């Protein structure tokens, strides 16, 4: 294990306030430092153009910072989490906003729970789009339907951003699976959020 006295500091990005408090107290009690919290007032360098900047989730800001520093701008970030978020960043490091859609797990769970004769299936890339049985048909609808959602939102965001070359990066646990079925994503970066946390930590630690 690691020596608890060996940590110089830490940073927390959380969209669950009760958990944020628990993590903050844990760091102070067991690790000996007060963590930096990603939220209003944090130095990130990004200019947030949302109607109410406080509404932007900490994870979206962290991803935006990492994507801009790693890939430049303009850039679109697609994060496959509990919800799937789409975020638009300009060449001048402005956070324009984005879109929030139900995550693929939430969508599939709704299908299982609302349709009495349907059952849970593995979320996987089907061999074909035309299913030959109920399980195959559900896998096809879930997988290819979700790819359609992603591609359409990315295309429309690019249009609103003025077109041209706009890099698109995806992150989140299901990014490799979903992005294997589309050419609209330029890179899958599973370290994006952690890289963003490090960048923001370095900017605020002093």
Give residue ranges: language-model regions.
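Short, surface-exposed recognition loops or helix-turn segments adjacent to catalytic cores
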Residues: 80-83, 126
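Nucleotide/phosphate-binding catalytic cleft detector across ATP-hydrolyzing
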Residues: 1-76, 91-206
């Amino acid at each position: 294990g690691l020596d608890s006295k060996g940590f110089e500091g830490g940073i927390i990005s959380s969209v669950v306030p009760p958990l944020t408090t628990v993590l903050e107290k844990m760091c102070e009690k067991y690790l000996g430092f007060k963590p930096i919290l990603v939220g209003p007032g944090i130095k990130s360098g990004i200019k947030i153009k949302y109607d109410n900047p406080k509404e932007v989730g900490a994870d979206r800001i962290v991803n935006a910072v990492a994507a801009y520093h790693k890939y430049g701008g303009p850039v679109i970030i697609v994060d496959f989490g509990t919800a799937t978020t789409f975020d638009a960043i300009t060449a001048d490091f402005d956070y324009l906003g984005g879109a929030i859609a139900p995550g693929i797990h939430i969508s599939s769970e709704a299908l299982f729970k609302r349709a009495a004769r349907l059952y849970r299936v593995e979320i996987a890339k089907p061999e074909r789009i035309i299913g030959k049985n109920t399980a195959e048909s559900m896998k096809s609808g879930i997988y290819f339907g979700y790819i359609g959602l992603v591609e359409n939102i990315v295309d429309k965001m690019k249009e609103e951003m003025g077109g041209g070359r706009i890099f698109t990066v995806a992150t989140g646990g299901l990014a490799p699976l979903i992005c294997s079925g589309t050419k609209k994503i330029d890179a899958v970066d599973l370290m994006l959020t952690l890289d963003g946390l490090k960048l923001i930590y370095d900017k605020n630690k002093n």
